[in-house]
Design a protein with these regions (language model features):
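Short Asp/Glu-rich motifs
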Residues: 19, 53-56, 137
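Charged, often glycine-rich, active-site loop that binds/positions anionic groups
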Residues: 51-80
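A short, Lys/Arg-enriched amphipathic alpha-helix followed by its capping loop at the start of a domain
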Residues: 31-40
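Nucleotide-activated donor-dependent transferases that construct or modify glycoconjugates
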Residues: 5-19, 96
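Residues that mark the start of a beta-strand
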Residues: 4-7, 41, 117
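Glycine- and acidic-residue-enriched helix-capping/strand-helix junction motifs
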Residues: 16-28
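Glycine-rich beta-alpha loop elements in corrinoid/cobalamin-binding modules
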Residues: 34, 44-51, 74-139
Length: 139
C-alpha cells in the first residue's frame, strides 16, 4: 500500500486564450519533479474548454462558465494519460488537490474548488500561483 497521500496538480482552463496549450505553468512541474525525487508520485490534470463551448462563449460573452464545458487531460505519474470530458469523479482518487492559478483562471479555480468541497469535503485543496499571491483576501 502506498503510504503517501495521492496528489493531483490542477491547471484550470485559460478560457480567454485561443489556444490553451500555448504555454505551460511551470510551478506544478517543478513541484512534481521535487516530489518524484523524494518518492512521492503525483498526477497532473489540465482542464481546457471544448471547442463547442469556446464558439458559444465567443457568440455570447455573458454565457456563464460551466464545468461541463471542460475537457480534462490527465497525465498520470506512471506515464499514462487520458483526455476526456470533465467528470467530477476525477477527484475521487486524491487526498490533496493543488491548483496553480493565474488571475484569468481564478473564476474556474473557484468553480472547481467549490465542486471539490461539495462532493469530497475530505480532500485538502491548495491554491497557489500568481493570483493567490497578489489577491490573498479574495482567495
Amino acid at each position: 500500500m502506498n503510504s503517501h497521500k495521492q496528489i493531483l496538480f490542477v491547471k484550470p482552463p485559460d478560457r480567454f486564450l485561443e489556444n490553451e496549450f500555448v504555454y505551460q505553468q511551470l510551478g506544478p512541474h517543478y513541484l512534481q519533479s521535487f516530489l518524484a525525487e523524494h518518492g512521492v508520485p503525483s498526477d497532473l490534470a489540465i482542464f481546457y474548454q471544448t471547442e463547442e463551448a469556446r464558439t458559444e462563449r465567443c457568440a455570447n460573452p455573458e454565457r456563464p462558465l460551466l464545468l461541463e464545458d471542460l475537457k480534462t487531460l490527465l497525465i498520470r505519474s506512471d506515464g499514462t494519460s487520458s483526455d476526456e470530458l470533465f467528470d467530477e469523479k476525477i477527484f475521487l482518487d486524491y487526498e490533496v488537490i493543488a491548483m496553480s492559478v493565474m488571475t484569468p483562471q481564478a473564476s474556474d479555480a473557484y468553480l472547481l474548488n467549490k465542486k471539490i468541497k461539495e462532493l469530497h469535503p475530505r480532500i485538502t485543496s491548495v491554491i497557489g500561483g500568481s493570483h493567490p499571491r497578489y489577491y490573498q483576501k479574495q482567495v
